[in-house]
Amino acid sequence: MLRRATLLLLVLSSAPLGAHQQKAALTTVRYNPRSDEVEIAHRFALHDAEHAAPEVTGGDAILRSDTARQWAFARYVHEAFRLTDERGAALPKDLVGVEVDGSLLWIYETLPAEAGPRIARIRHEALLALWPSQENWVNVVDAEGVRTLILRREAPEQALANAPSRPLPQ
């Protein structure tokens, strides 16, 4: 009986844990008519963000409970995510919030409404230097539909015009 219990314990302790690095982030860019702003919502797996925290926030942290480190990570993402116009000029974004929701870390930014139509290129470098397989997916939602860019270490920036538009679900 003890042998079986020991064997069972060994098998269970060697099983992969549910928490693992997703190596992907999702950002949604869309106009909100109520606020008359373009809202940017970045979604990171909390587990991934906590693994990256020592590198990007300057210290170990349990982001779930450390508000200062959440904001440090948010500032890192704010700097790593850039929107530019057709001339290459950066469009002005404001970092407005960060929150933990279950197993996700959300970071919120806004852009003045008049700048939204001028978005020509998107660059998203968050976590790309840390993990070669990291992908940053960016969905841009507008009246024509959804355009998706998949940004990777070898191509962290793309022209929005290169992304085909898919209609919004009815």
Model-identified regions with their sequence ranges:
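Bacterial N-terminal signal peptides that target proteins for export
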Residues: M1-L7
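N-terminal soluble domains immediately following signal/targeting peptides that reside
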Residues: A19-Q170
